[in-house]
Structures are given as structure tokens and as C-alpha cells.
Amino acid sequence: SYAELIRQVASEMPGVDLTGIGARLVWTPDRRFSIVPEDAALAVFLQDCDEVAARQAAAKLRPQDEAGRAIIIEWTTARAGRVPRIYVEARQDLSVPLVLQRRMQELVPCAHCISLDCGHVPQLAQPGELTKQLAKMLAGFSTTRPATA
């Protein structure tokens, strides 16, 4: 889970700020959903985006079911790598610090990486560069299905 990842990295790298958005979340009474306040979204998710676009994006955020962040994926050697994966690394991400992003990439081998010098929302902060790099990478993927054993 994401919480476990944070605990692991925090124990290995004391003093590294891994707070992200966590401290600014607002919770429903049953703690099943978290809500990102607009000011927090602007400061942590959208800090490098056009101000008007950032405000529009922040206004569209909705409560998030915490079950999604608690998921633990079980990878198998037989299935891992059958579907090409692209990780978009956001080097200035204030929500998921780069050290956590890189650890996630280590845990899911064989992913291709696009590294952008932007915050948490590259599709809004650098849409042209993201599209260019995605198109280039996708053009290199095979369109045929791999043989099954």
C-alpha cells in the first residue's frame, strides 16, 4: 500500500519530507473518503499550472475512496511485463515526492519512464511535452499480442 511505502522510505531516509497532501486532507466522519480542499490542491497538486486552469481543475476534484490507496497489487513473474507500462515521473511533485516515485518504479520493473520537470499534474502543467513524449514512446510499442504459453 502507499502508506506502507511511505513507512519504508521514511525508515530508510529519516528527515526526508514525505508529507505530500496527507496533512491537508479533510476526512468524512467514517474516514472512508478523503477530500482535498481547493487551496491545498492549488498549493500541492497544481502549483506549476496556469492559474485559471489550476483553479478550474481544483474545483473539479471530488472525494476519493481510500480503498484505492490501500490496494496491494500482487505481481507474478508469468504476468508481469505482458502489458507495456509507462510511468510519468513528475520531478517537482509536492504530493508524491520523487524519492517515492522512484521507489514505486523499482517495485514495478519493466515500466518505461517519461521524466518531466513539473508537479503532480503533468497533463495540465506540460501538456505539449507530455503528449510528445507519450506519442514517441507509444509508437515504439508493438501492436501484436504476445504469444501465450
What are these regions (language model features)?
Residues 7-14, 46, 50, 62, ...:
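A generic structural signal for secondary-structure junctions
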